[in-house]
Amino acid sequence: MWDAPDGGVPIGLAVSGERSVERFAPLGDHLIAVEPDGELVSGWSKARPAGLARAIGQIPICWAPDRQQAIDLAHEQFRWFGGGWYVNADLPTPAGFDAASQFVRKEDVAGSIACGPDLDELAESVRPYLRAGFTDVALVQVGDALQQEFLDKAAGPLLDKLRALAP
């Protein structure tokens, strides 16, 4: 249907530590990570013959008109995220995720995922990735019930705030 771009399709590869950087940096074009670790970015850049292309951080947020509603939603659908990459990589099934996250409290989620209608707080949650040298940050809006409302009410103003943070 479409022609492939000249030079091929760039490939982004998720990494979590020194071993994955050493193994995948020579193979991939872009780094993807879920933790704002500057050592991943610098290690990727050093391990690639062409240097750093893009370093893409991925971070969950949970916008809702009410902060408690956002916390409840993030706890219900994303509480596993607080365990970090090493825990997530070792959980092969939904049952494993449930078991590993069964004792995660709502306040734990609120401390690790920016939740609520405060766009400044949501934007600030990206700052650690910028400080770590990431070139791009992908926001994951938790939950499906509020996606359209998020897009209609918050996405544009949030994007403006994020652009203002960019170096």
Predicted regions and their residues:
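Active-site-adjacent structural elements that line small-molecule/cofactor binding pockets in enzymes
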Residues: 1-167
